[in-house]
Each structure stands twice: as C-alpha cells, then as structure tokens.
A protein has these predicted regions:
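Active-site rim beta-loop-alpha module in soluble metabolic enzymes
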Residues: 56-131
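Short, acidic/small-residue loops that bind anionic groups at enzyme active sites
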Residues: 24-48, 137-157
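Short, charged, surface-exposed secondary-structure boundary motifs
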Residues: 42-48, 64-65, 92-93, 159-163
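N-terminal glycine-rich "phosphate-gripper" loop used for MgATP/nucleotide binding
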Residues: 6-22, 121-129
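Short glycine-/acidic-enriched loop or helix-start segments at secondary-structure transitions
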Residues: 21-23, 64, 131-133, 161
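C-terminal functional extensions of proteins
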Residues: 151-170
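Metallocofactor- and cofactor-centric catalytic cores in central/energy metabolism, strongly enriched
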Residues: 1-2, 6-7, 116
C-alpha cells in the first residue's frame, strides 16, 4: 500500500455494519488486515460459544446486521441466534437518560439469554463499556452461568493486531 496505508499494520473500521469501506481497503491494500467491527465481533464470538446473538440500537439495523452475519458465516447458520434491537439511538446510548438506557440494555440482554444466546455481541460501537449491564440482564433472565460479552471495537483491534503480528505476507 502507498500513502497513509503504508504506515499502518492494519485497519479496523469502527462501524458495526457490513461496511463497504472494508472491501475497498482490501482492494487497494491486499497485504493489510482490514476488518469492520461486525466481522471482528462475530469471529471472536464464534470462538466463545455455540449460539451467538447481537444486541443493537434501532430495529432498522436488524435486517442489515442479519445479512452481514450471513455473509460472514457463508449463509444461514444455527450458530446465529439473531439480533435484538433495543430501540435506543446511537447518541442516546452515551448521553440519554442513564436509567432508561441501562434498563433497556438489561432487558434486551435478558431477552437474548432467554432465546438461548450463549455469547452476546454489543452491536454498536456506542455500546462500549456496557458489558456489565448485559451480564446483569443475563442474570435477571435466570441464567446462572456467565455469558461472554463481545465488544466489536476491542475484538477488531485484537484481531487486526494479532494478524499483523503473524506476518502472514512475509
């Protein structure tokens, strides 16, 4: 890669979607690991459990996320437990009424646990730091075992860093 891409070990596109920037970057920099946080989160989650589910923001995101997961998995899979929309906006996650946001995230996590999710993915970069709320929701659903909670931003940084450290391209 030339220009700014020549100075980086990899790229994480921090938008929780099947983002079109990823294939573009892979085309111009084929020796550079490039992921979006949806892909990174799903890949991490698959290593942690058998029924991966996503908690996201608005209901309008669900069809796109479902399609993105199918693309990552190569089709429909019983390992994908689906996506639950919280109805919260991206900005609202961080600046909205804290009690409402917390209760909504806990409720969605409880619903996911009842639906059999054994790994829960935070389906928005704005959900970073909400792992504890998700764990509370899982407990409120009566689950006695902990459920891994995957933050796609963290997963992306670690995935790209790990790939870069392996020097697969020599």
């Amino acid at each position: 890669a030339d220009g700014p891409l020549a100075q980086v070990a990899g790229v994480v596109v921090c938008c929780f979607s099947d983002h079109p920037l990823v294939p573009m970057l892979r085309h111009v920099a084929p020796a550079l690991p490039v992921v979006h946080i949806l892909e990174a989160a799903v890949l991490h989650a698959l290593a942690l459990g058998n029924r991966v589910g996503i908690l996201t923001t608005g209901a309008a995101m669900v069809p796109d996320l479902d399609a993105g997961v199918r693309r990552i998995l190569g089709g429909a899979s019983p390992r994908y437990a689906g996506c639950i929309a919280t109805g919260l906006g991206v900005v609202e996650l961080q600046t909205g009424d804290r009690a409402k946001v917390d209760a909504t995230v806990r409720h969605a996590a409880a619903q996911g646990a009842r639906q059999g999710m054994d790994v829960i993915v935070l389906g928005c970069a704005g959900m970073t730091g909400m792992e504890g709320l998700v764990q509370q929701g899982v407990r409120e659903a009566g689950r006695t075992t902990r459920v891994p909670v995957v933050d796609g931003s963290k997963a992306g940084v670690h995935l790209v860093g790990g790939i870069a450290a392996c020097h697969y391209w020599g």
